[in-house]
């Protein structure tokens, strides 16, 4: 709970007191590992322009980045996580209900660390990145506005650089058990196969990436495109795209 409070309030330590309010110790943010994490100074780009239709009816009132998780909107939780690792420059690509997003963050302590890029039309999960051409000249984190990845971002950067990746896709391992027997039907209605409660494991795309700035130069302006299509384009050019599981 102390760690969560420090992240939300952007403070580095909290005193631990007993019932008589005598200090018994100090709890440091990230257990004192902040000094090392501050070395991670990369821009963060957040795709925050979608309508959030899968979250209806909530997103009919609030834009998806402002959907609350506890006391804070999810976008602020995401930003706080990056701040934990020393990131201090945030680029938000906005469209739907963008004035609400800007108004909210204007009242926060991190207002001066955020730059907005306004889409004039929906450009998909990748097209909006064309607005950042010439603005970013180093590797950057790219994240959806509805996913909190609890990983070591410094380790992701180390993996990205050691493998000379153009794009690193952060994936999550998922394991599912279908709670029913699954039947495969053959020709004529015969049973070709029958498996009781089969289990499947696979890697899923979290919507969290580490991207080299050269990728921005290949994105056409004012063209709607998904970031997975951008990934495929880079792979087609022989660029290295790797998975961080």
Predicted region positions:
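A short, conserved acidic/glycine-rich loop-to-beta-strand motif
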Residues: 163-173
């Amino acid at each position: 709970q102390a760690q969560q409070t420090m992240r939300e309030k952007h403070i580095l330590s909290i005193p631990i007191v007993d019932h008589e309010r005598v200090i018994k110790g100090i709890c440091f943010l990230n257990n004192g590992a902040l000094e090392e994490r501050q070395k991670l100074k990369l821009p963060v780009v957040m795709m925050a322009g979608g309508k959030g239709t899968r979250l209806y009816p909530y997103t009919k009132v609030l834009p998806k980045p402002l959907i609350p998780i506890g006391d804070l909107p999810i976008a602020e939780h995401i930003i706080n996580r990056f701040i934990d690792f020393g990131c201090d420059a945030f680029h938000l690509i906005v469209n739907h209900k963008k004035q609400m997003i800007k108004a909210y963050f204007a009242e926060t302590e991190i207002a001066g660390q955020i730059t907005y890029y306004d889409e004039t039309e929906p450009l998909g999960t990748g097209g909006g990145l064309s607005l950042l051409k010439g603005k970013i000249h180093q590797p950057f984190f790219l994240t959806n506005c509805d996913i909190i990845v609890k990983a070591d971002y410094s380790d992701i950067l180390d993996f990205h650089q050691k493998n000379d990746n153009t794009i690193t896709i952060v994936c999550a391992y998922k394991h599912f058990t279908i709670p029913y027997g699954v039947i495969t039907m053959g020709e004529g209605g015969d049973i070709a196969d029958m498996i009781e409660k089969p289990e499947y494991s696979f890697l899923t795309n979290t919507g969290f990436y580490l991207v080299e700035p050269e990728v921005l130069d290949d994105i056409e302006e004012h063209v709607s495109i998904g970031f997975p299509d951008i990934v495929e384009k880079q792979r087609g050019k022989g660029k290295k795209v790797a998975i961080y599981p």
